[in-house]
């Protein structure tokens, strides 16, 4: 399933201090935000690497919306995963762009024919999709670009919550400390692509809550080997 990326859950622990050098890279230097959607997916009776490759090839030919900036599939890489199903992720420039994109997709006869044709390969819960504000707080290409031939990479996701009495501003300080640690790594030793992003919840208006919320942290590595290297360094 070369065109899909993989999930591997870990417990993510961050140790933070409040000292950040004035000339270091911080959250505010990047702060690139998108509207991301997640859909739970289940494999059908015709699920195989070949059938998925064919399905994805046709899917890419249907994409012509410039506001859809990314689409990824995830399958479990371990029996110990938090979820035994797969996931489909879409990244849009905004919530409004996502709504317009879905309206266009649902009215496209070719898109509907594609969905029906491959229903036995993979079925995704479109109506039950969840929405998140996705934030790159650090340059996703700081460690280089991800391999593009297969498009696969290794990822892990961790559920997070703010500690009691801590605010979102406190969290930003912690993020800046993590960025400072990333900046300290030897790029010759850590030469494979790595990026991370935050999946922040939205209220009914698509806005971020101000306190008492849970979120997801996503790590994206070029390979499971580089994931292990990074985890050991941390």
What does each model-identified segment do?
Residues 4-14:
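Sec-dependent N-terminal signal peptides
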Residues 16-234:
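Short S/T/G/P-rich N-terminal loop/turn motif that feeds into the first structured element of a domain
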């Amino acid at each position: 399933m070369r065109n899909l990326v993989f999930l591997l859950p870990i417990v993510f622990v961050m140790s933070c201090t409040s000292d950040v050098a004035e000339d270091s890279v911080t959250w505010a230097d990047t702060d690139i935000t998108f509207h991301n959607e997640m859909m739970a997916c289940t494999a059908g009776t015709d699920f195989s690497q070949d059938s998925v490759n064919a399905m994805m090839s046709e899917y890419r030919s249907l994409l012509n919306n410039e506001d859809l900036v990314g689409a990824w599939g995830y399958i479990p890489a371990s029996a110990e995963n938090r979820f035994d199903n797969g996931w489909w992720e879409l990244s849009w420039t905004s919530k409004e762009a996502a709504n317009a994109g879905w309206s266009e997709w649902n009215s496209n006869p070719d898109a509907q024919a594609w969905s029906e044709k491959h229903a036995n390969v993979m079925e995704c819960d479109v109506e039950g999709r969840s929405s998140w504000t996705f934030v790159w707080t650090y340059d996703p290409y700081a460690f280089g670009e991800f391999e593009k031939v297969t498009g696969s990479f290794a990822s892990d996701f961790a559920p997070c919550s703010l500690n009691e009495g801590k605010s979102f501003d406190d969290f930003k300080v912690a993020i800046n400390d993590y960025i400072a640690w990333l900046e300290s790594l030897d790029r010759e030793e850590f030469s494979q692509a790595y990026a991370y992003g935050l999946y922040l919840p939205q209220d009914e208006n698509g806005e971020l809550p101000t306190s008492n919320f849970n979120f997801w942290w996503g790590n994206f590595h070029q390979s499971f080997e580089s994931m292990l290297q990074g985890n050991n360094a941390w």
